[in-house]
Swiss-Prot record:
Originating species: Cereibacter sphaeroides (strain ATCC 17025 / ATH 2.4.3) (Rhodobacter sphaeroides)
This protein's GO CC annotations: cytoplasm
PANTHER family to which the protein is assigned, alphabetical: UREASE
Compartments where found: Cytoplasm
Reaction equation(s) it catalyzes: urea + 2 H2O + H(+) = hydrogencarbonate + 2 NH4(+)
Pfam family, one: Urease_alpha
Start and end residues of each Urease domain: 131-568
Annotated binding of substrate, by residue: 221
Gene: ureC
Protein name: Urease subunit alpha
PROSITE patterns linked to this entry: UREASE_1, UREASE_2, UREASE_3
Length: 568
């Protein structure tokens, strides 16, 4: 006869199930399990006296007969598409199946086969998310990659060549020679990488050669001159070669205002960086572009969320990042024109409304590369505290808000940059770039990061201990070394470079994948973040209105996922 056990006992053994709720870290965000794809009474679990043993939950089937390489058991999947529990089967570095794992010879309803060649990762009581994507990287130093990976980011996209002054200010890897060297350098790192060429030119030849060399996208930056002519030329090349264009507009309004920039864009797809404006862009009203159908608006994390310290720290950051001089009044005025508490406050609310679609870092160039995920969830917490539950929520949970915010650093940047056929969600057929979290540490410290189905970093204790013992901290694992690194991570390039055999030409050890589908998309393609309010900015007070409503909120003095999580 069937046995009954309490919900708490079940959750302790197999993880939460349908209707159970749990808190994310020390935030005020509560998620509820929407459905459970496992079968009560037939759950699989590894360990002494448990289910996954020969002839029980483990079948005799070989890999050739369909057995998985790895199964993550009883995981609580947190994805833009939903919050649900399932077993996840991995094969050949990709997500082969999401459903019910086990032995089809002894158990009903099994669609994920466990065999003698299957490794098990225990997902009970853990949250499983897609690896994050940071789409605004200044490649100033290689050490950024470790900080980013260990925070839960598995794909980094941006530009640079190291601590050259062009890179310190702009996310561009300029020219075929530098692009080639950075593609070769990418072979050393256990993370997916993609590089942006410089998009500032008035004639196409200099841009086309960068795309053919391997640039996956092009960046227009005001420090190189984001004029209407450069915007038009860059977008024309991008449309012809299917790469995305990112734009940092003209803060000083020297070559036109936001309306002139939108006219130069001409309805074509573009990814607008730090659309609030503190990171740069038409002062004071670049934020208006969140209402444009063809613009994908994103934020960088130094303004996210708005706190008691946000405004104060930004002036110094600006002076350093843009090679400014405090002794020159015009340089100081330039910096001060970009820091507006009114637009920074409005940014939080526009994210909560789903009007801003992406969050990224702006690494070492006014952003913190290891805090994209943390600051996303701090912002979601702040908005719940200040604005209450979203009107779209059903039940005693924050599922809709949580799904909206996770989309900002997973699926939406992947769609924007033509990578969503490979990454961005927990979905069958996509790369097994996955992150496991203990709920109490969600958003702060991942338990484990998988890249291409192999563990590349994890919380690990004393290597000399008889068991993994405290202190635990995130360390690189076997997937981050040797040939496994090259088999697990990939480098994203343009279709033109892929067709030209860029991997063979540069003797790359990592595989390359081509971006595709970057043109003709827009705000409507941003999952759960497609809202297009009409934005007005008062040019004297900087007051922001969305569809006539004033957008303002107070800075927080204390945040979750902060100092208590980072004592060491």
């Amino acid at each position: 006869m069937p046995a009954s056990i309490s919900r708490s006992t079940y959750a302790a053994m197999f993880g939460p199930t349908t209707g159970d709720r749990l808190r994310l870290g020390d935030t005020d965000l509560i998620i509820e399990v929407e459905r459970d794809l496992t079968t009560y009474g037939e759950e699989v679990k590894f360990g002494g006296g448990k289910v996954i043993r020969d002839g029980m939950g483990q079948s005799q089937r070989t890999r050739a007969d369909g057995a998985m390489d790895t199964v993550i058991t009883n995981a609580l999947i947190l994805d833009w598409s939903g919050i649900y529990k399932a077993d996840v089967g991995l094969r050949d570095g990709r997500i082969a199946k999401i459903g019910k794992a086990g032995n089809p010879d002894t158990q009903p309803g099994v669609d994920i086969v466990i065999g003698p060649g299957t490794e098990i990762i225990a997902g009970e009581g853990r949250i499983l998310t897609a690896g994050g994507m940071d789409a605004h990287i200044h490649f100033i130093c290689p050490q950024q990659i470790e900080d980013s990976l260990h925070s839960g980011i598995t794909t980094m996209l941006g530009g640079g060549t190291g601590p050259a002054h062009g890179t310190l200010a702009t996310t561009c890897t300029p020219g075929p020679w530098h692009i080639g060297r950075m593609l070769q350098a990418a072979d050393a790192f256990p993370i997916n990488l993609a590089f942006a060429g410089k998009g500032n030119a008035s004639l196409p030849a200099g841009l086309e050669e960068q795309v053919r060399a391997g640039a996956s996208c092009l960046k227009l930056h005001e420090d190189w001159g984001t004029t209407p002519a450069a915007i038009d030329c860059c977008l024309t090349v991008a449309d012809a070669m299917d790469v995305q264009v990112m734009i940092h507009t003209d803060t000083l309004n020297e070559s036109g205002f936001v309306e002139n920039t939108l006219a130069a864009i001409g309805g074509r797809t573009i990814h607008a960086f730090h659309t609030e404006g503190a990171g740069g862009g038409h002062a004071p009203d670049i934020i208006k572009v969140v209402g444009a159908a063809n613009v994908i608006p994103s934020s960088t994390n130094p303004t996210m969320p708005y706190t008691a310290n946000t405004v104060e720290e930004h002036l110094d950051m600006l002076m350093v990042c843009h090679h400014l001089d405090r002794s020159i009044p015009e340089d100081v005025a330039f910096a001060e024109s970009r820091i507006r508490k009114e637009t920074i406050a409005a940014e939080d609310i526009l994210h909560d409304m789903g009007a801003f679609s992406v969050i990224s870092s702006d690494s070492q160039a006014m952003g913190r590369v290891g805090e994209v995920i943390t600051r996303t969830w701090q912002t979601a917490h702040k908005m719940k505290v200040q604005r209450g539950r979203l009107a779209e929520e059903t039940g005693a949970n924050d599922n809709m808000r949580v799904r909206r915010y996770i989309a900002k650093y997973t699926i939406n940047p992947a769609i924007a940059h033509g990578l969503s056929h490979h990454i961005g969600s927990v979905e069958e057929g996509k790369r097994a770039d996955l992150v496991l979290w203990t709920p109490a540490f969600f958003g702060a410290k991942p338990d484990m990061v998988l890249l291409g189905g192999m563990i590349v970093c994890a919380q690990m204790g004393d290597p000399n201990g008889s068991i993994p013992a405290q202190p635990f901290y995130s360390r690189p694992m076997f997937g981050a070394f040797g040939g496994a690194l090259h088999a697990s991570a990939v480098t994203f390039v343009s279709q033109a470079a892929q067709a030209d055999g860029v991997g063979e030409r540069l003797r790359l050890q990592k595989g390359t994948l081509a971006v595709e589908g970057t043109r003709g998309i827009g705000k409507a393609d941003m999952k759960l973040n497609a809202h297009r309010p009409a934005i007005e900015v008062n040019p004297e007070t900087y007051e922001v209105r969305a569809d006539g409503e004033i957008l303002t909120c107070q800075p927080l003095a204390e945040l979750p996922l902060a100092q208590r999580y980072f004592l060491y």
